């Protein structure tokens, strides 16, 4: 949802949080500007399985049920609609593969007042097509609707990510102010059931009665104001962002065995990955090479940024060892960044 520019500074670290700085060399890169007038609140991002350097996005609540694919220069490649979906408060997207098929997920999980007893995930096969230079691909897509609730009551959420094989979805609640009930935002895991075919069928059909799924709290996250999350294609990196920065978790094998994400959240410290300063930066997504991030903002004609997660400035070592400053009782942190233009 739209917020005042000043509110991006009301962020979100806990003074007790410890963050390891990411390796330092390199800079942010601007790729282009989203050209579509229809994309005014890019709230989520999902990597395309079929087209390199292309991503799917969608608008926040109040903008219908369209999903858009754009290229690295900001050009619109596809403009599709989910014909059997509703946009109560869409906040995130993800992509995954399952049973030899390529899927996209749209998460209707926004709940600013934390009153929703059930939320929805819309899952559909990514359409495969040959892009055209002067005309965007358009099709009505049918999605499978999954309904879920949180085990400990309604939660506001803007960050959702799916593991590459589509077995689990992770969600993080968005909290600005500390409360007596929960100091840190919860990280939740939702196990996905087998997907019911057919998806993207041309005929209209009635949704079967859905079994209510339950998202279980598996860990806490030491930073507030979370707006986006993504898992790398190889399943070894997970990034969580807020309006000013991002935090990178990595699965490192021990005795030849990778830990679960629950173990990583519990036992490891995230590395800091600063974000470009945006009016309302929310969406984030890994690229195919597992080493870069694409980030957008909830404003019209926003800049598309590319971030190298393995290349940040050495000065962060000192920045993240300092105590965060506080404004109006809300702790905040900001890191100046060097940027470069893509050639």
What are these regions (language model features)?
Residues 1-9:
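Bacterial N-terminal signal peptides
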Residues 12-14:
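N-terminal signal peptide c-region/cleavage motif recognized by signal peptidases
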């Amino acid at each position: 949802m739209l917020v005042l520019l000043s509110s991006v500074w009301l962020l979100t670290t806990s003074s007790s949080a410890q963050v390891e700085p990411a390796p330092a060399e390199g800079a942010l890169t601007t790729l282009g500007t989203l050209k579509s007038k229809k994309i005014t609140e890019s709230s989520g991002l999902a990597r395309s399985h079929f087209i390199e350097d292309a991503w799917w996005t969608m608008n926040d609540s109040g903008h219908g049920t369209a999903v858009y694919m754009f290229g690295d220069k900001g050009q619109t490649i596809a403009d599709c609609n989910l014909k059997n979906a509703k946009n109560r408060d869409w906040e995130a997207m993800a992509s995954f593969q399952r049973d030899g098929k390529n899927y996209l997920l749209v998460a209707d999980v926004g709940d600013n007042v934390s009153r929703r007893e059930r939320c929805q995930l819309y899952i559909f096969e990514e359409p495969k097509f040959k892009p055209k230079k002067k005309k965007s691909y358009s099709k009505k897509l049918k999605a499978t609707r999954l309904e879920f609730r949180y085990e400990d009551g309604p939660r506001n959420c803007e960050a959702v990510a799916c593991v590459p094989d589509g077995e689990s979805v992770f969600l993080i609640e968005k909290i600005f102010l500390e409360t007596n009930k929960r100091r840190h935002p919860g990280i939740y895991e939702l196990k996905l059931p087998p997907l019911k075919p057919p998806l993207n069928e041309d005929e209209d059909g009635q949704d079967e009665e859905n079994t209510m799924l339950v998202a279980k709290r598996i860990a806490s996250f030491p930073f507030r104001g979370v707006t986006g999350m993504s898992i790398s294609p190889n399943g070894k990196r997970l990034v969580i962002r807020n309006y000013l920065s991002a935090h990178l978790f990595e699965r490192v094998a021990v005795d030849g065995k990778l830990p679960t994400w629950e173990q990583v959240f519990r036992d490891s410290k995230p590395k800091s990955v600063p974000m470009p300063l945006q009016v309302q930066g929310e969406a984030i997504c890994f690229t195919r090479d597992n080493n870069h991030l694409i980030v957008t903002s909830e404003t019209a004609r926003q800049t598309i940024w590319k971030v190298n997660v393995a290349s940040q400035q050495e000065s962060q070592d000192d920045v993240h060892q300092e105590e965060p400053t506080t404004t109006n009782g809300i702790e905040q942190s900001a890191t100046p960044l060097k940027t470069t233009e893509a050639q």
